[in-house]
């Protein structure tokens, strides 16, 4: 274990990283939870009133950007470190959520660019926290499991949207605008906690004893 990092510091970092991953890492992949309900609902029912074909095109386009994101955000991670990578990713997600919230079918149909921004930023969130495994040199497998597991848990976010719309009558604008605020809070966490250089761990040098 690197002596300069306390147990509290290491645990706090992995908890924050997993929280960010759950709330931002892979939310696009839970799209099926809202594609047949919230997104189809008319404005009077709290939805944007999108058609099946439009929703299909929207998520196909967003899926493309979710695969493009790691390439470009990975380059940012290599050049500028985890802090800049995470902040950039979170800003894409936040701006995408806000843009989705202010979009509407007749006047400002920007749903495709909005969801594409959310999809683009998601993978960068996970890329920016992978280095946290180095804080746990003796338990890297466990730390990696937490990170990958939290990414998969993010699939539930749109299901939560659907339940809030169905049972509590929150409209899509309130849901996405609120989530934009959550992403802005995540941006602040990234600014405060993530380092400019990834955490590293070097194996202790082997001691060679020569017998003469």
Where are the predicted features?
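C-terminal ends and interior cores of transmembrane alpha-helices
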Residues: 91-105
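Cytoplasmic membrane-interface "Motif A"-like loop-to-helix N-cap segments
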Residues: 78-90
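Long, low-complexity inter-transmembrane loops of multi-pass membrane transporters
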Residues: 194-212
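Hydrophobic core of transmembrane alpha-helices in multi-pass small-molecule transporters
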Residues: 108-125
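Symmetry-related core transmembrane helices of the 12-TM Major Facilitator Superfamily/SLC fold
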Residues: 173-192
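Cytosolic juxtamembrane N-terminal segment immediately preceding the first transmembrane helix
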Residues: 1-33, 49, 195-198
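Intracellular juxtamembrane helix-capping segments at the cytosolic ends
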Residues: 38, 122-146
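Central cavity-lining transmembrane alpha-helices of secondary-active solute carriers
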Residues: 57-75
């Amino acid at each position: 274990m690197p002596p300069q990092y306390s147990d509290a510091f290491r645990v706090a970092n992995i908890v924050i990283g997993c929280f960010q991953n759950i709330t931002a890492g892979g939310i696009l992949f839970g799209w099926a939870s809202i594609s047949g309900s919230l997104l189809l609902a008319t404005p009077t029912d709290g939805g944007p009133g999108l058609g099946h074909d439009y929703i299909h095109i929207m998520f196909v386009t967003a899926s493309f950007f979710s695969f493009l994101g790691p390439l470009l955000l990975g380059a940012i991670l290599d050049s500028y470190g985890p802090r800049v990578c995470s902040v950039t990713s979170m800003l894409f997600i936040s701006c995408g959520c806000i843009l989705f919230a202010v979009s509407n079918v007749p006047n400002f149909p920007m749903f495709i660019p909005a969801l594409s921004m959310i999809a683009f930023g998601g993978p960068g969130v996970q890329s920016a926290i992978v280095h946290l495994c180095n804080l746990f040199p003796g338990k890297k497998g466990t730390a990696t499991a937490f990170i990958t597991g939290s990414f998969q848990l993010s699939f539930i976010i749109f299901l939560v949207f659907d339940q809030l719309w169905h049972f509590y009558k929150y409209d899509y604008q309130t849901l996405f605008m609120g989530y934009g605020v959550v992403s802005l809070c995540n941006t602040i966490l990234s600014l405060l906690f993530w380092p400019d250089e990834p955490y590293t761990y070097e194996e202790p040098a082997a001691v060679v004893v020569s017998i003469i």
